[in-house]
A protein has these predicted regions:
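Alpha-helical adaptor scaffolds
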Residues: 73-75, 90-91, 103-108, 281-294, ...
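Bacterial N-terminal signal peptides
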Residues: 12-23
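Catalytic glycan-binding domains that act on GlcNAc-containing polysaccharides
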Residues: 66, 71, 269, 273, ...
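Structural motif corresponding to the intra-repeat A-B loop/turn of tetratricopeptide repeats
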Residues: 47, 76, 80, 109, ...
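Inward-facing hydrophobic residues that define packing positions of alpha-helical scaffold repeats
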Residues: 53-57, 86-90, 119-123, 149-156, ...
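Generic helix N-cap/helix-start motif at coil->alpha-helix transitions
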Residues: 29-37, 49, 61-68, 81, ...
């Protein structure tokens, strides 16, 4: 239709749209130029000494990340910064993360100087524990009397080790009697129970005389139980001494249950235990004898006094009975679970499975039907047992252009997305977290969807998975990113693309720069040694660990490694997943001990909690990704061949199960009309 025959309103809209479109290339070019100049200017301010960043930053004043240039200069030169310098910056960038960074850096400098008057003038509530304690010091310096419950207890009861900045505050509380010996002992014993020896030692240092000696003994017993408790037969039979032995033995059982058991045989009759002390030791021995599947594990668990039982001991009673194939004992152990535990789909599914083993299928069927309403590992397995479709009920996020525009223009999010575009992901995540703290729930949902649509998948995955209201947004929670690449590489490695996707999702949640404490890198969390070996054997380019942050290379190496892992276990994806997480040596030990178990029972008896949950998570994710790609999903039970049975990856022609939404039809998550979004910051 020619433009001149359009209605007047439509012609006006068309003209505006055309004008916007005509400016887009120039705007994109200008933003691209700004990004390059920002990189150069940011590199200059990060050097020692800083380069001529102002010349490089000319014309960047309206660029979202510009305040970071000034903030970096101020923070690096904070010892020479004047109050006027700081106030000028804070005034021009109010409420922003750069403003917060500069303020907190200046507060640390003022605390270092002991300038508590200035500190109080610049103070704003902070999440930083050092600064929280510095603020309490500033209040003390001003002559304020602190209230322990309101001011100090939130810091004191935090189980993490307290920073040195808190020492003067705690010393003052000890001096005025508000930090009592009882409070010190409570913190010390809580830390000892958690194995936090640093916090326990810090608490012990506040005591004196016999209390200090007793506290030091507890810290030593928890830190090095073998060496410390070797002398325990010569210790006096006193309450705090018994505490030291009990806490030490509980810790020792975690490390070496056999040696702890031998020591308990010597010390059990040596001291006059109270019930709490004795139960602590008995519980630890029973649980950790169970995690190693010791022959006496079941007897120890059954001998526990009711007051010595906890959720962990009750769960291990189920696993030990399950591993032994004692179905009646397993059912009795399931009956002994707490009311809250019995609501968990894991234990409801296992109850139904054990009932089938006892030929009580009529009792099992309604339990399977109930569990099958969940889109989870046990829910999918339950659906297979009663031959029902999977309960996958997808939702979509309703569009609201006005709210979306407001969210997209929110200045903190604008900086987050700009950092993401530049590939500066740690900085992007800091801005993202800062921005999300300001938004209400509906606005957060739209922000996460915006991140998804901009290819920042991990933000959507983390947010929607943590929010019960949005866990059915499967498109955002299970992105089909790099689809052509993942499918090609997985097929080339002889594995199911849905399984490869599930491993990526479980390992990194699509955080391309993920780097674990175990030194694993990237989407599929590859160790540098594994990556180097795979690259050499597959003739792929690899020079350094940071190369693994390249998602395409990571997938190429990871799928090949996963394929080789599967080959070691007859193609079995569930066993290969266990080895991918825990290593081949532990899986070998478990197979030697329990290879005759059904796959679902074997998974439940995996000793490592992380691996046990990881395998179930990967298998459930495989179903969801298969459904996302094909509209149907290979039965989960088909992905779980018995140990020793050969398994072949499914093809497009492999029969798959349908999905249903039994409770309701697919729904839409509607935006809240009351959604509030902080306004964009004024231009500078």
């Amino acid at each position: 239709m020619p433009i001149d025959v359009l209605p007047r309103g439509a012609r006006r809209l068309f003209a505006v749209a055309l004008a916007v479109l005509l400016t887009l290339p120039a705007a994109a070019q200008d933003r691209g130029s700004q990004r390059e100049r920002f990189r150069s200017a940011y590199a200059a301010v990060s050097r020692t000494p800083p380069g001529d960043w102002k010349k490089l930053a000319t014309g960047l004043e309206d660029y979202p990340l510009y305040p970071y240039l000034e903030a970096t200069v101020l923070r690096r030169g904070i010892t020479k910064a004047t109050r006027a310098d700081i106030e000028s910056f804070l005034t021009r960038w109010p409420g922003s993360l750069p403003e917060n960074d500069v303020r907190e850096t200046y507060l640390r400098e003022l605390a270092r100087r002991g300038d508590w008057t200035q500190f109080r003038a610049f103070w704003k509530s902070s999440r930083d524990r050092d600064l929280q304690c510095d603020n309490l010091r500033a209040r003390l310096a001003a002559g304020e009397k602190l209230d322990f419950a309101a001011d100090i207890d939130p810091i004191w009861t935090n189980p993490r080790t307290l920073p040195a900045a808190c020492d003067p505050v705690l010393a003052a509380a000890r001096g005025n009697g508000s930090l009592t010996d009882a409070r010190v002992w409570n913190r010390l014993l809580d830390a000892a129970a958690a194995g936090n020896t640093e916090s326990a030692a810090a608490a012990a240092s506040m005591l004196s005389g016999p209390d200090r000696e007793a506290a030091d003994r507890i810290v030593a017993a928890v830190s090095n139980p073998a060496a410390t408790l070797a002398k325990a037969e010569q210790w006096p039979d006193e309450p705090r001494v018994r505490d030291a032995v009990a806490y030490g033995l509980a810790r020792y059982a975690r490390r070496d249950s056999t040696s702890a058991e031998t020591l308990w045989a010597k010390l059990g009759s040596r001291f006059k235990w109270d019930d709490a002390q004795k139960n602590r030791v008995l519980n630890a021995l029973a649980v950790y004898r169970s995690t190693s599947y010791s022959p006496d594990a079941l007897a120890r668990l059954k001998a526990l006094p009711p007051e010595a039982e906890d959720d962990a001991s009750r769960e291990w009673h189920v696993r030990i009975a399950l591993a032994g194939g004692d179905w009646k004992e397993t059912l009795a152990a399931l009956d002994d679970l707490s009311a809250l535990q019995q609501k968990d789909s894991r234990w409801r599914y296992l109850r139904a499975r054990v009932l089938t083993k006892l030929d009580r299928k009529n009792e099992a069927a309604p339990i399977f039907a109930d569990v099958a309403h969940e889109a989870s590992f046990h829910g999918f397995l339950a659906a297979d047992w009663i031959d029902e479709p999977y309960a996958i009920c997808p939702r979509t996020l309703a569009a609201d252009p006005a709210v979306e525009k407001a969210v997209a223009s929110q200045s903190d999010l604008a900086r987050a997305f700009e950092f993401q575009t530049l590939g500066m992901l740690p900085e992007a995540r800091r801005e993202w977290d800062f921005a999300m703290r300001k938004l209400d729930d509906p606005a957060k949902r739209l922000a996460a969807d915006l991140a998804y649509r901009r290819g920042w998948y991990d933000r959507a995955v983390f947010f929607y998975s943590a929010d019960p209201e949005t866990q059915r947004l499967y498109e955002q929670r299970f992105p089909l990113a790099l689809e052509t690449h993942v499918k090609r590489e997985a097929s080339g490695a002889g594995i199911d693309p849905a399984w490869a996707y599930a491993i990526i999702r479980a390992e990194s949640a699509w955080m391309t720069d993920a780097h674990s404490h175990a030194d694993a890198y990237g989407l599929m969390q590859l160790l540098p040694g594994v990556a180097k070996h795979m690259a050499q054997s597959e003739k792929l380019p690899y020079n350094r660990p940071s190369d693994l942050f390249d998602p395409t290379l990571n997938v190429e190496l990871g799928t090949r490694y996963l394929g080789r892992m599967a080959d070691r276990y007859d193609g079995s994806p569930w066993l290969a997943s266990a080895a991918y997480n825990a290593g081949e040596a532990p899986v070998g030990r478990w197979l030697d001990a329990r290879a005759t178990l059904d796959p679902d029972f074997f998974i439940e008896t995996i000793p490592y909690k992380e691996t046990r949950e990881y395998v179930g998570r990967v298998l459930a994710f495989s179903v969801i990704y298969d459904w996302r790609m094909n509209g149907k999903a290979l039965a989960l039970s088909a992905r779980m061949p018995r140990i020793g049975q050969a398994y072949a990856a499914p093809s497009d022609a492999t029969p798959r199960k349908g999905v249903v939404c039994p409770a309701e039809t697919a729904a839409t998550v509607a935006p809240d009309p009351s959604t509030t979004v902080p306004p964009a910051a004024p231009a500078h």
